[in-house]
Amino acid sequence: QKRIGGYDELRRYFGKKVKAEGATSYQPVLAVFGVSALLALAVGWMLGGLFTIRTAELFIAFSMSILALLKLQDVESFSTMFLNYDLLAQRHVRYSYLYPFGELLAGVLMVAGALLWIAIPVALVIGTVGAISVFKAVFIDRRELKCACVGGSSNVPLGFVSLTENLMMMGMGVWML
């Protein structure tokens, strides 16, 4: 009788595919965007309009807030990963610690539709700096880095998803001007 311990070992025993140690995955980001979309649709339903511009605004604001929450779980780890590619954080390390708080502030204020004179510039600054930084790291320098977008302990590859996050923040800031 063979003793099998652990989920991965059980999958191997039955001939199933086992995810390689340290393999990259978009699953955490897909979960965030999926939950954000469902929340936005639920609030849209409550407000009487399921597929409206406000629902799209809420989707982006909820995404920003949830992504910020994931970063705030371990700010130190996030900061370490963020310093690998963010141009402003490389010049001013303190920015890497303030970034998740700024993203959360902008997201929550956008959900509430309150104090937009604070939310808009914060979203524009962090979104623009982030988009430029990701574009430079991935498409110009051709570096293969892990994205700090869902916190510091993820294996999400830096690239399209992080660029999308930053472009969504920029777009939301411009839209709400």
PLM feature spans:
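Membrane-interfacial helix-loop segments of redox and metal-homeostasis proteins
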Residues: 19-177
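Extended, hydrophilic extramembrane loops/domains of integral membrane proteins
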Residues: 2-17
